[in-house]
Amino acid sequence: MDPRSEVLLRQAELFQGSVLLAGLPADDLLGRLPDAFGWCWHAGDQAALDARFEGRSHFGVNVPERSFDTAVVFLPKAKDLTDYILNAVASRLAGREVYLVGEKRSGIEGASKQLNPFGKPRKLDSARHCQLWQVTVANAPEAKPLESLAQTYELPLAEGPLKVISLPGVFSHGRLDRGSALLLEHLDKLPSGHLLDFGCGAGVLGAAVKRRYPHNQVTLLDVDAFAAASSRLTLAANGLEAEVLTGDGIDAAPMGLNAILSNPPFHVGVHTDYFATENLLRKAAKHLKNGGELRLVANSFLKYQPLIEEHLGVCAIKAEGNGFRIYRAKRG
């Protein structure tokens, strides 16, 4: 069981009523708290929770409509996402309790200060390298629309400026990361047909490709509901239409693709995790048509080339710079 859940269960008597678990892990916590309900924005965790506790977790970027008497927020990685989630639950809980739980290495001690606008926070427990904080909501805020927290920036592309809408919690929030910047410079000679932006984040690559290749079908895929929402906003801001999907990795992608583009993630929260990318490299051939192309950017220190050649075919380094490389391979 996740150590954060174990800390909650040390105080299980506090969580026996109708409690919302925001950002909960995919463990047995719902089984131990029979009246609790989850709010999840990670598609993989949601699928695991649905398989074990069908109908007891809500997936998306907005707080569930159902009523709840208290809420536990599992500390997200991003400070602005924490603010959004805390605001969303506290706006529904005037005079009642909000709890914040997280690992010490995730910054829970500092994050506890984000409870200050609602009342006087206090530490209830510290165990398993985690802390549990509580506040009684004396100052219930007005709920903030998620779009009001978006950051917007423009990219000067050859086809004209591209407006990017980034929501809290999305990778490289409010700015273009160096890997995507390099890949944007090397979108030439992509195949016609169906293109996938894998791990789309705010939709930068998918929108740029749709702008440059308007007759191609473009799909954007991410595991995170906030990323998918950002991508939809980015597409709409530029008058572009493309399919946006949430799903856990390449297994959620369509078949028969002509190209897969990616600046793949290798962090989950504060943890390093290469599984999604390595799984992409192992299974890309299954999702690509014959002659279909994989084009991805990654940190130069990540040795992806042998894995690509093992599972897809000859892999070339198309470009490199600023500590990143672009790999290109075709399904033979």
From Swiss-Prot:
Q: Which reaction equation describes what this protein catalyses?
A: guanosine(1207) in 16S rRNA + S-adenosyl-L-methionine = N(2)-methylguanosine(1207) in 16S rRNA + S-adenosyl-L-homocysteine + H(+)
Q: What is its EC number?
A: 2.1.1.172
Looking at the record's lineage, which domain of life comes first? Bacteria
Cellular component, GO, one term = cytoplasm
EC top class, in one word?
transferase
The places in or outside the cell where this protein is found are: Cytoplasm
One molecular function GO term is: 16S rRNA (guanine(1207)-N(2))-methyltransferase activity
Q: Which InterPro entries match?
A: Mtase_sm_N, rRNA_ssu_MeTfrase_C, RsmC/RlmG, SAM-dependent_MTases_sf, Small_mtfrase_dom
Pfam families linked to this entry: MTS, MTS_N
Q: Which CDD domains match?
A: AdoMet_MTases
Q: Give the UniProt keywords, A-Z.
A: Cytoplasm, Methyltransferase, rRNA processing, S-adenosyl-L-methionine, Transferase
Q: What does this protein do, in the record's words?
A: Specifically methylates the guanine in position 1207 of 16S rRNA in the 30S particle.
Oligomeric and partner information: Monomer.
Family membership noted in the UniProt record = Belongs to the methyltransferase superfamily. RsmC family.
Q: What is this protein called?
A: Ribosomal RNA small subunit methyltransferase C
Q: Which gene encodes it?
A: rsmC
